[in-house]
């Protein structure tokens, strides 16, 4: 595999993570990670795309998240872009140097910047027609936003009509909520994580009367396609029309003055009634903005210099251990409640055992808590001057607090892991979710909600239970159809999906076990190397039984080998695998000498097959070396038809694609050794 192919695999994973967190942040207003962690994901992607520019055309930059389906969509006349971020003074300087270079400016030519607060709220756009408010929308994914017109009309001091405005006017700004209003909102029984989420959730209410009660504020920052000469002039014009703009704005052509403005606002941020998370630097000259243009994601003429996280001091009452789905034991600080940036913090991450020892953190200490990215709190230091009595050192557990299994710490790693694997109930639900996922057993209809249901009723408490589910339901005389969400069709579909999944290829089986460092790519390498389940299992037992035994496979490193060894040392995992394979047919990986009549061909299925399910047919075809597609094209080699074929049959005839019956296809997939 080439470096670029490996980079593409990494980018696939990064994009999947980024889109997932975009959905949580922009659409559901419930982020799971900090701004800093999200920025790091985007930064990793930028580094790879910079190294492999040809991959840029393969990946479309999405902005934000897709519009909430509860609201009608609004197509933006011009894309609502996001901003590139700077995290230190050097990043800002690089931006300014790059900008001057793009503009082909001489050293003695001045370049003026507008310096504005980055308010932590929700971006929105308003269109006025003939001076009257016509439509308001969120940013959404940059192309389409959500129609929030009626909600925006409830915001105090926002003009519904404008005097002396052009016939068509689009302005953009930020909706936010003051910290005190946010605290009051939560005191009234709401449960927003922070002011930004409160503002975003309030503006997305289906009932505008609820929005009207939320004391939302706004700040306008741009006129789309403005005839103004400068950003400063645009802000003044917005003011003259009656819009709120931010008073904390300066323009300067001096780099140090721009940085001083950042430092001043960072130091005074607690005196501002609303949350800000950085300073935005914009080229002040609008003509130069147009010359610089944009990338697919952000303008080249602006950058956001992000603030570091907010900190506070409180007492650490207790250190508890949380066991994650990968088995990592994460120490958690149970804190005396502290309000940081308008959010009451009671728990914070201590990262790992090494961090506790390095910082000498003890129960009863007063600790410095930081909200990384203003979202996820973590303990960053201890105020030992307040340690007036002798406090006991914290002893990290030597057994998993959830299941009692042995814990281990790999060489050159800081994390400590539970060896319980699928025996550990804290890990089990997430492990099972991985087990049934698309790239593993691909059991459709067994998602998070369904798994939790079966787990709570004791029907699926380990992966073996999946394949005895029907028997358990019958033995316990449980009428699934009497429960909400379970109809006869959904039950039959699920049981059928489970039954079909019992035929699985070796690489998917290896991947399904969720062994650390064994992702899709490594699982495929292992499968292609060992060919059969028996060969693979035998070698894994050798690894577990002899610490000096190893396997030599290209791209399978020492970390992966040690992880495999650790997994197979644990008797719980061996018992699980041995019980599991009794329910399965594990298809050997295709060797290099394997050929069939459909090897290397692109095929499509239509109609209902009589001998097997569609998913099983897909697996058998792929094992025989074919590529299975869901749609016909001029590149399709064969269309396989079952009973009651659909419209693909006629389309295949019109495209002169060869059509095979199910019986002929079964002959074509037979392997031949050469």
Swiss-Prot record:
UniProt entry tagged with the keyword Ligase: yes
Gene3D superfamilies noted in UniProt: 5' to 3' exonuclease, C-terminal subdomain, 6.20.10.30, BRCT domain, DNA ligase/mRNA capping enzyme, Helix hairpin bin, Nucleic acid-binding proteins
BP GO annotations: DNA repair; DNA replication
One GO CC annotation: cytosol
One Pfam family named in its UniProt record: HHH_2
Residues annotated as binding Zn(2+): 400, 403, 418, 424
Cofactors, names only: Mg(2+); Mn(2+)
Xref: SUPFAM superfamilies: BRCT domain, DNA ligase/mRNA capping enzyme, catalytic domain, Nucleic acid-binding proteins, RuvA domain 2-like
Keywords of this entry: DNA damage, DNA repair, DNA replication, Ligase, Magnesium, Manganese, Metal-binding, NAD, Zinc
A single MF term (Gene Ontology): metal ion binding
All residue ranges annotated as the BRCT domain in the record: 593-674
EC number(s) recorded for this UniProt protein: 6.5.1.2
Reactions it catalyzes: NAD(+) + (deoxyribonucleotide)n-3'-hydroxyl + 5'-phospho-(deoxyribonucleotide)m = (deoxyribonucleotide)n+m + AMP + beta-nicotinamide D-nucleotide
Keyword Ligase: yes
Catalytic residues as annotated in Swiss-Prot or TrEMBL: 118 (n6-amp-lysine intermediate)
UniProt superkingdom: Bacteria
Record SMART domains: BRCT, LIGANc
Binding site for NAD(+): 35-39, 82-83, 116, 139, 174, 282, 306
Entry-linked InterPro entries: BRCT_dom (IPR001357), BRCT_dom_sf (IPR036420), DisA/LigA_HHH (IPR041663), DNA_ligase (IPR001679), DNA_ligase_AS (IPR018239), DNAligase_adenylation (IPR013839), DNAligase_N (IPR013840), NA-bd_OB-fold (IPR012340)
Function: DNA ligase that catalyzes the formation of phosphodiester linkages between 5'-phosphoryl and 3'-hydroxyl groups in double-stranded DNA using NAD as a coenzyme and as the energy source for the reaction. It is essential for DNA replication and repair of damaged DNA.
HAMAP family: DNA_ligase_A
Family, per entry: Belongs to the NAD-dependent DNA ligase family. LigA subfamily.
Protein name: DNA ligase
Source organism of the structure: Ehrlichia ruminantium (strain Welgevonden)
Lineage of the organism: Bacteria, Pseudomonadati, Pseudomonadota, Alphaproteobacteria, Rickettsiales
């Amino acid at each position: 595999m080439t470096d670029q192919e490996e980079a593409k695999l990494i980018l696939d994973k990064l994009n999947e993570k980024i889109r997932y967190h975009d959905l949580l942040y922009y659409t559901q207003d419930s982020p799971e990670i900090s701004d800093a962690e999200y920025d790091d994901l985007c930064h990793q992607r930028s580094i790879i795309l910079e190294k492999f520019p040809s991959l840029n055309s393969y990946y479309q930059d999405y902005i934000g998240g897709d519009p909430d389906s509860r609201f009608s969509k609004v197509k933006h006349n011009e894309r609502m872009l996001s901003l590139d971020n700077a995290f230190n003074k050097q990043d800002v300087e690089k931006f300014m140097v790059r900008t001057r270079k793009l503009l082909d400016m001489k050293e003695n030519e001045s370049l003026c910047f507008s310096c504005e607060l980055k308010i932590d709220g929700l971006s929105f756009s308003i269109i006025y027609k003939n001076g009257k408010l016509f439509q308001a929308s969120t940013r959404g994914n940059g192309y389409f936003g959500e129609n929030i017109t009626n909600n925006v009309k409830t915001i105090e001091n926002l003009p519904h009509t404008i005097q002396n405005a052009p016939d068509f006017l689009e302005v953009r700004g930020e909706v936010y909520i003051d910290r005190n209003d946010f605290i009051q909102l939560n005191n009234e029984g709401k449960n927003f994580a922070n002011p930004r989420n409160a503002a975003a959730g309030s503006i997305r209410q289906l009932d505008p009367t609820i929005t009207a009660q939320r004391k939302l504020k706004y700040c306008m920052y741009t006129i789309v396609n403005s005839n103004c000469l400068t950003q400063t002039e645009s802000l003044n014009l917005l003011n003259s029309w009656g819009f709120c703009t931010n008073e904390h704005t300066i323009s300067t052509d001096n780099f140090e003055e721009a940085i001083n403005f950042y430092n001043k606002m960072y130091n005074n941020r607690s005196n501002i009634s609303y949350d800000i998370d950085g300073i935005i630097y914009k080229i002040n000259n609008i003509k130069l903005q147009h010359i610089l243009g944009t990338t697919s994601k952000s303008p080249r003429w602006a950058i956001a210099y992000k603030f570091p996280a907010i900190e506070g001091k409180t007492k650490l009452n207790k250190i508890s251990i949380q066991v994650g789905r990968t088995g990592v034991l994460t120490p958690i600080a149970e804190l005396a409640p502290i309000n940081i940036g308008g959010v009451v913090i009671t728990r914070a991450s201590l990262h790992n055992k090494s961090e506790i020892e390095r910082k000498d953190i003890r129960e009863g200490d007063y600790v410095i808590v930081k909200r990384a990215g203003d979202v996820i709190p973590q303990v960053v230091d201890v105020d030992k001057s307040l340690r007036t009595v002798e406090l006991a050192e914290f002893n990290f557990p030597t057994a998993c607090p959830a299941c009692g299994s042995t814990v281990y710490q790999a060489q050159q790693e800081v994390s400590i892991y539970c060896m319980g694997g699928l025996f550990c109930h804290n890990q089990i639900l997430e492990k099972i979710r991985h087990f049934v996922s698309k790239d593993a057993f691909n059991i459709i209809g067994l998602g998070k909600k369904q798994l939790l249901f079966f787990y709570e009723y004791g029907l699926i408490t380990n992966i073996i239970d999946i394949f005895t589910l029907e028997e358990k339901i019958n033995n316990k005389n449980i009428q699934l159809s009497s429960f909400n969400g379970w109809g006869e069709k959904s039950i039959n579909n699920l049981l059928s999906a489970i039954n079909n999944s019992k035929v699985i290829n070796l690489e998917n089986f290896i991947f399904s076990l969720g062994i650390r460092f064994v992702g899709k790519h490594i699982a495929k390498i292992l499968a292609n190397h060992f060919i059969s389940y028996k060969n693979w299992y035998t070698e894994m037992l050798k690894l577990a039984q002899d610490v000096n035994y190893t396997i030599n496979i290209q791209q399978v490193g020492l970390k992966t080998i040690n992880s495999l060894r650790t997994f197979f040392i644990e008797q719980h995992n061996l018992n699980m695998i041995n019980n599991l394979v009794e329910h399965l047919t594990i298809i050997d990986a295709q060797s290099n000498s394997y050929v069939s009549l459909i090897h290397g061909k692109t095929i499509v299925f239509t109609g209902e097959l009589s001998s097997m399910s569609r998913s099983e047919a897909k697996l058998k075809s792929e094992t025989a070396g074919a590529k299975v597609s869901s749609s016909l094209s001029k590149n399709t080699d064969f269309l396989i038809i079952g009973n009651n074929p659909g419209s693909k049959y006629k389309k295949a005839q019109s495209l002169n694609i060869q059509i095979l019956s199910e019986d002929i296809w079964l002959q074509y997939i037979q392997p031949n050794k050469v």
